[in-house]
Structure formats: structure tokens, C-alpha cells
Amino acid sequence: MKEFKFNDEQLSTIQELEVDIDLKKLEIAISKESIDELSEDELLALLKVTNALYRSGFPVIEDILYDSFWNKFALNHPNHPFITSVETEVLNLGKTVALPQKMLSTDKAYSKEEIKKWLDRILKAAEELDIDTNEIEIRITPKLDGYAAFDDGERLYTRGDGVKGQDVSRAFERGLKVVRNSERGLGAGEIVINKAYFEKKLSQYFENSRNIQAAIIAEKNVDERVLEAIKEGACVFHPFAVLPNWTGNYQDLMTDFDGIIEQVWNSVEYDVDGVILEATDTRIKEHMGANRKFHRWQIAFKINDEVAEVEVISVTPQTSRTGRVTPVAELVPTRISGAMISRVTVHHYNMVKINGVGPGAIVQIVRSGLVIPKIEKVIKPVDPQMPELCPSCKSHLLWESDHLVCPNKSDCPAQTENTLVHFFKTLANNDGFGPKNIEKLANLGVKHIHQMYDLKPHQFAMYGFGEKTSKNLYDQLQASKNIEIEDWRFLSAFGVSRLGGGNCEKLLQHYSLRELFEATVEDIAELNGFARVSAEAIVKGLANIKEEFFKVYDLGFNLSITPKQSELESLASPLTGKIVVFTGKMLQGKRSDMEKHAKALGAKVGTSVTSNTTYLIAGLKVGETKINDAKEKGVKVLSEQEYLDLIS
């Protein structure tokens, strides 16, 4: 058992509650995940404290554990105000005002049997109203795990106690948008952040997404990274009214319960902690009504995450192409959610250090559905050993914030080899230089991209390749220079931090490649979508690759130039500023050519459909599921001919 201690931020939140409680007792209960030693008053205090911390962005126990504690208190005190009222927030965010309409909590069910009991109550209400039960429809939507709020078109309010909330309109003033740029005033919803965006860009800085959601509405200055997420549309207000849904007969629901629940659960790009089921008939809603806390015609279905306690065998350091050393926990093989799990990645070595992850540690891993397993907590910590040397080049590692980093950028095999792999993988026009051939060449001293292009056929032969293979490799290198490639793709192939394909394309809409290397932090930070922290990383990264970049650039690659923003804005095109995605086989030419043409007309071309996509252009052999998913997200689906008519 790892001993739990409230940190300073959590203690500050608890002080605002003004609860009279021995915090040491609460820390012990949280450590043990047991309330056996607490009195009823202490249990109530624990519920208030953990609820307050959760709503403030500092969750300390799992939802399922909180629900079990809540259920035990409710069993003994069913009429207590804490049980019968909406759980209130504790953050002092602004003026408290009456909500335009009540925002109640939702009752919960954890099994199909509980859902059947709820449906029986719906059927009973229908019979009492003389409604044909065969006509009863159930609507199911994802249960967003965000920050609940209400948008009346002019102001944004927190849920508060369900009757009164706090004015947090500052979130919209900071740039927060309604999902898919929908209109304001759609009522209740949640502030959420795109899961993939959080994992890729924010998880190393914030412990969980609730930290982000709370920060968006807080009175204090907002972290630049959060503002950048808002600018990029990763953080949005998602009204419940525009959620994707399944609506159908209750009998159909029970026939394919698991399949329907899974479909709805995975229909959004945000954290979801269940689905919401509700009767659609307004007569049934009015008849069943609500108590002080829940609507009786509505229920949330939640699935318990599958967890397992596993022993750590070792922690293996792996050096990435950026130089960061990632800890990988090797585990005693354990089956969870139908898969054999033997390793999990830990975010960074500071987590290893703080949480005590090392050989002999007992960790709890969790896997929700098909999600990659992660360490949820450490049950039995150990004193971990921190690596001092890079596992690849044996250079002494340095601490940079939470990360151990190898400073040997030019000679570390892992960094140079992975950089070469990344370059050829990103260019995607040369299948002879995969990881195996690159590893072979790197081991023989070919460390840089320009060195690879300097090789002659006889040198490949000297490195152990056959005569025919040597000629093929040489020919492929020469061909890769002649095949047309976008300038943004060429730049992104060098693997600079914060310079993926999307950001490269944005920057090259304002600068040529040569101009970009002269841009300052201030220049880049002024552009839409680039916060200062990103600008600093980009300028530093470009400086690091400048010499190598121009050695390769000067070899004469056939680069197509990204149209400049000023040119795009002057276009009178129906695609200007729109986000389009192409899918399926096209009849009028290659899909890649159509994508390039769409960009020239001012469109942004995506690789997958999201809630921000404007058009999905569907060619031949596109599955019905993909089409329906796009429509549920509010995306207009065009055939190839409809698209051509649009742009002609």
C-alpha cells in the first residue's frame, strides 16, 4: 500500500470546504481504499472532500470507488441533503446566479440487469398513460467526462447545485468555441478536450484532462498550453443537444445491448465515462418527473474498468529520436480485457521516481475496452534506480523538467538511427530504407541523412549489400529527390519537436523554407495556433537541424511550394477555410492529387473525420459505417461528382 498525502493545491481546495475533519484519517482511508475505520460523519466528510477535489481538477480516487462509498452512505442516510441534492462545486469562479433551467445529476447503473429494471419503470409509466409500449423509444448518447456548464447564448454558467451556478463566460472570451463551430445558446453541455490531443501534447504537463477543464474557467491566468489547445479547437464546449446518438425501440436495444453501447461509447473524440439512456416521449418524462437530484426518465450506464495488480520485473530505458529516454515497465505477463499484457510505458522518469516504479513494485494496471493499458497507481512502491547513462550511446543523461534526456544529438545511435527512419518514413517515397537497412547502415557509421544520399552503389556493396540490392538502393535515393514532394512534408521529415505535418504546413503558409529558419520566437508566436511555448521549441529545434537541413535541401529535391495565406485568402473558392477529408477510390485521378488540388483552393485536408470536418468526399468502396459516423458528427458527405460540381 502506497501512503497517500494531500498536496498543497488539494489542501487549499479542502480549506474552502470548512469541514471539521481529521485529514490524517482521510489520507489513511484513501490509501487503504477502505472506509471501515471511519464514522458516518467522517465518511460524509470524505465524500465531500473527494467530490470537491474531483470537481476542482484533482481527483484522488476512482469513480467506482467514490460511487461505492456514496452508496454505503446513501443506504444508511437516504434522506440526507448530500444524497438528495446535486453535488455542488467548490471552486469560487464568479458571481452565483440562477440557472436558466435546472441541471440535475444522473442516476447510475453498472449492469444490464439494472438497465432492465429502469426500463420496467419506463414501461410501467407508459402503461399508466395508456401508451403502446411498442412505440417507446430510447435515446442513447455518450456521457462526456468533462466540466458541466450551461450556455444560454449570452453567458456560460457552471452547474453549481443544479439550480444556481457561477458565471464563467470568461471561457468564451478566452477563445473557447462550441463544437463544430455550432451556434451559441444550445443549453447544457460540457467543456471537454480531445483525447488524442491531450495524450500527444499535454499529458506530460498535466496529470489528467480535468486539470485542463478546470483551468479554462478559472479566474487566474491560463497556462499557454491550454490557450493553445483552445486555439487549435482541441478544447471545446460540447452541448448535449448535438451529441451523436442511437435512438430506437427498447426491444432492439436489449437485443443488441453490448453492440449499441460500444457504438455510442466510441462515437466521440473526448473522454467518456459511460452513456446516457433516456425516454424520448415527453409524456413519459412529465409523468415520471424527477427527485431533487435525478430525472427518473434518464439513467447513466457505466462500465467498470478492468484492473489487475501486477509485479514489475524491470524498467527498461529507451532513447527516442528526440533524445528523451522513455521508461518501459516490464511486467509479469497478465491477461486483462482479453489481452496478455507484459509491458506498459510510463510517461517519464519523474513518474518512476515519485511513484516508486521499479523491480518488485506492485502496480495496478487498468484497461478500458481496447484502450492501451496504463499504470493507474502503485500499490507497493520500491526505491527505483534512475539510469545515469543513455542506453544507446552511454552519454550521461540530463534532467529536463520531468524527463531524462540524452544530450548527444549528433552521435547517439538511437537518435541518429530513429531520425533516419523518421525521415524516410515521412517522405514515403522510398521503400528500400526501412528500419532494418537503416540499422545496418547506421551500425557501419552512416549517421546523417546527407551521408545516406552521398553513398554510391559500390559503397552499399562494401557495407554488405548484394550488387543488385546496392544498385536498387542507390536508384531509389536518386528517385526520391526527383519525385515531387510537398515542402511541408519535407520539413516535417526532420523530426523537429512541435513540427508535425500540420504545423509545418501552417508555417509555410507564411514563410518560405529559407525564411522560416530566420523567424524569431515573436514572429511565430504571433501566428494563429502557435503559443509562445511552441514557438520557443520550434525556433530551438530549427536551429539544431539547420546545418543538416540545408545540406539535404541543397541536394535539389523536387519540392512543391505551399500556397501562402495571403494568396489563399484572396481566392473566391467554396473550399477556402473548409476542412475536407477524402476516402475511398476516386475515378477522376489519384486521391493524393485531389488532396493537393483542394489545398490549392484554400482547403485544409484532414486524414480522418472529426467534429471539425466540413466535407467527407466519398469515392468507391466506402463502408456504410464510415458514412454514418461522419453524418452523426454533423459532417456533410459528398460523392466524388458532387465534390467536382462544388468546385467547378
From Swiss-Prot:
Active site: K143 (n6-amp-lysine intermediate)
Keywords: DNA damage, DNA repair, DNA replication, Ligase, Magnesium, Manganese, Metal-binding, NAD, Zinc
The reaction(s) this protein catalyses: NAD(+) + (deoxyribonucleotide)n-3'-hydroxyl + 5'-phospho-(deoxyribonucleotide)m = (deoxyribonucleotide)n+m + AMP + beta-nicotinamide D-nucleotide
Family matches, as InterPro entries: BRCT_dom, BRCT_dom_sf, DNA_ligase, DNAligase_adenylation, DNAligase_N, NA-bd_OB-fold, NAD_DNA_ligase_OB, RuvA_2-like
Example GO biological process: DNA repair
Positions of the BRCT domain: 570-648
Database matches in Gene3D superfamilies: 5' to 3' exonuclease, C-terminal subdomain (1.10.150.20), BRCT domain (3.40.50.10190), DNA ligase/mRNA capping enzyme (3.30.470.30), Nucleic acid-binding proteins (2.40.50.140)
Annotated GO MF terms: DNA ligase (NAD+) activity; metal ion binding
Binding site for NAD(+): D63, I64, L65, Y66, D67, S105, T106, R159, E190, K302
Pfam families linked: BRCT (PF00533), DNA_ligase_aden (PF01653), DNA_ligase_OB (PF03120)
SMART domains referenced in this protein's UniProt entry, alphabetically: BRCT (SM00292), LIGANc (SM00532)
EC number: 6.5.1.2
SUPFAM superfamilies: BRCT domain, DNA ligase/mRNA capping enzyme, catalytic domain, Nucleic acid-binding proteins, RuvA domain 2-like
Positions of Zn(2+) binding: C390, C393, C406, C412
Cofactor: Mg(2+); Mn(2+)
Top-level taxon of the source organism: Bacteria
Stated family: Belongs to the NAD-dependent DNA ligase family. LigA subfamily.
Function text: DNA ligase that catalyzes the formation of phosphodiester linkages between 5'-phosphoryl and 3'-hydroxyl groups in double-stranded DNA using NAD as a coenzyme and as the energy source for the reaction. It is essential for DNA replication and repair of damaged DNA.
Protein name: DNA ligase
Organism: Shewanella baltica (strain OS155 / ATCC BAA-1091)
Lineage: Bacteria, Pseudomonadati, Pseudomonadota, Gammaproteobacteria, Alteromonadales
